Design a protein with these regions (language model features):
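Conserved beta-strand-loop surface patch within small alpha/beta domains used
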Residues: 1-79, 87-133
Length: 133
């Protein structure tokens, strides 16, 4: 299980900019990098179109999501997680997030009106330590 998520200040700023640019709707994307033991290292946050374009949910564009997985693999990387925003609420998983996390075994980074937090699903939602590098 992932216990730590290391992400650059640059990628944190990119996700925050996505939150602001897409308000009041949720924005989303993928986190590309590597996993070393229980630490996921984000090398790139890649915005992906939210095909739902709503205030309370997101759905990654399937073609862009596939291309991100494909491109990451070609470069010896993985999609280590996904991110999405809660532009008018806190950075905690919603009921929909929790139900979806159970079937999406990766890190979920949520940027909310009150900051940014990371989570994984392991017999329930678990907090992942977010480390800015």
């Amino acid at each position: 299980m992932i216990h730590e998520l290391k992400i650059s200040h640059r990628d944190i700023e990119l996700i925050q900019a996505e939150l602001e640019a897409n308000k009041p709707y949720e924005a989303c994307g993928v986190l590309i990098g590597t996993i070393d033991g229980s630490t996921a290292h984000v090398e790139k946050a890649l915005p992906v179109t939210n095909v739902k374009r709503t205030r309370t949910s997101f759905e990654l564009d399937p073609n862009e999501h596939y291309n991100a997985w494909n491109d990451a693999g070609k470069n010896g990387k993985d999609v280590v997680g996904i991110y999405h925003t809660h532009p008018v609420s806190s950075a905690v998983p919603s009921l929909w997030d929790r139900e979806t996390m159970e079937n999406e075994p990766s890190v979920w980074l949520i940027a909310g009106a009150d900051g940014m937090r990371a989570y994984v699903w392991e017999n329930g939602v678990k907090v992942v330590k977010l480390i800015e590098i």
